[in-house]
């Protein structure tokens, strides 16, 4: 039972981190950007900076579940990647 609680807690934390990362990734305009600077970093290895811009287009427009789809308020919505 203790292992089940621990696994559930780890799963919830991982899911929260994934959701937070997805929220931050969707907040950028115009695709992926990687602009970083290592300024004012004294020391031998303290100014290292590695960034990887990743753009994954995902459409989540009008997603809902209904028995009668015509009466669905999301019926006819259009989602397009530019």
Curated annotation (Swiss-Prot):
Gene name per UniProt = chpE
The induction field says: Highly expressed in 24 hour cultures while still submerged, during aerial hyphae formation on minimal medium, decreases once aerial growth ceases. Strongly induced during aerial hyphae formation and sporulation on rich medium, under control of ECF sigma factor BldN; more strongly expressed when sporulation is blocked by deletion of whiB, whiD or whiH. Expression depends on bldB but not bldA, bldD or bldH (at protein level).
Keyword set, alphabetical order: Amyloid, Cell adhesion, Cell wall, Fimbrium, Secreted, Signal
Chaplin domain: residues covered: 41-81
Entry remark concerning the domains of this protein: The mature protein has a random coil structure at acidic pH, rapidly changing to beta-sheet as the pH rises (examined from pH 3.0 to 10.0); at pH 6.7 and higher forms amyloid fibrils visible by electron microscopy.
Give the protein name, as stated in the record.
Answer: Chaplin-E
Compartments, as annotated in UniProt: Cell surface; Secreted, Cell wall; Fimbrium
Q: Which GO terms describe its biological process?
A: cell adhesion
What's the domain of life for this entry? Bacteria
Q: Print the organism lineage.
A: Bacteria, Bacillati, Actinomycetota, Actinomycetes, Kitasatosporales
Classify the main location. Answer: other
The biotechnology note for this entry reads:
The small chaplin mixture (a cell wall extract of an rdlA-rdlB knockout) forms a stable coat on a number of surfaces (including Teflon and cotton) and emulsifies oil-water mixtures, which could be useful in medical and technical applications.
InterPro entries assigned: ChpA-H (IPR005528)
Q: Does the keyword Secreted apply?
A: yes
Q: Explain the purpose of this protein.
A: One of 8 partially redundant surface-active proteins required for efficient formation of aerial mycelium; the short chaplins assemble into a hydrophobic, amyloidal fibrillar surface layer that envelopes and protects aerial hyphae and spores, presumably anchored to the long chaplins. Chaplins have an overlapping function with the surface-active SapB peptide; chaplins are essential on minimal medium while on rich medium both chaplins and SapB are required for efficient aerial hyphae formation. Chaplins are also involved in cell attachment to a hydrophobic surface.
What is the consequence of disrupting this locus?
Answer: Essential, it cannot be disrupted individually in a wild-type strain; the lethal effects of its disruption are suppressed by loss of some other chaplins, the roldet protein (RdlA and RdlB) or by inactivation of the tat secretion pathway. Quintuple knockout chpA-chpB-chpC-chpD-chpH has strongly delayed aerial hyphae formation, makes many fewer aerial hyphae but no effect on viability of the spores produced. Further deletion of chpE leads to more severe effects, and on rich media few aerial hyphae are produced after prolonged growth.
Q: What is the annotated signal peptide range for this record?
A: 1-27
Q: Which family does it belong to?
A: Belongs to the chaplin family. Short chaplin subfamily.
Where is it found, in Gene Ontology cellular component terms?
Answer: cell surface; extracellular region; pilus
What is the protein's species of origin?
Answer: Streptomyces coelicolor (strain ATCC BAA-471 / A3(2) / M145)
Signal as a keyword of this entry, yes or no, is yes
């Amino acid at each position: 039972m203790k292992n089940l609680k621990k696994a559930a807690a780890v799963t919830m934390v991982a899911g929260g981190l994934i959701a937070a990362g997805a929220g931050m990734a969707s907040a950028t305009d115009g695709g992926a950007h990687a602009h970083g600077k290592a300024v004012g970093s004294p020391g031998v290895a303290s100014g290292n900076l590695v960034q990887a811009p990743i753009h994954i287009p995902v459409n989540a427009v009008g997603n809902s579940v209904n028995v009668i789809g015509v009466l669905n308020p999301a019926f006819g919505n259009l989602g397009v990647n530019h």
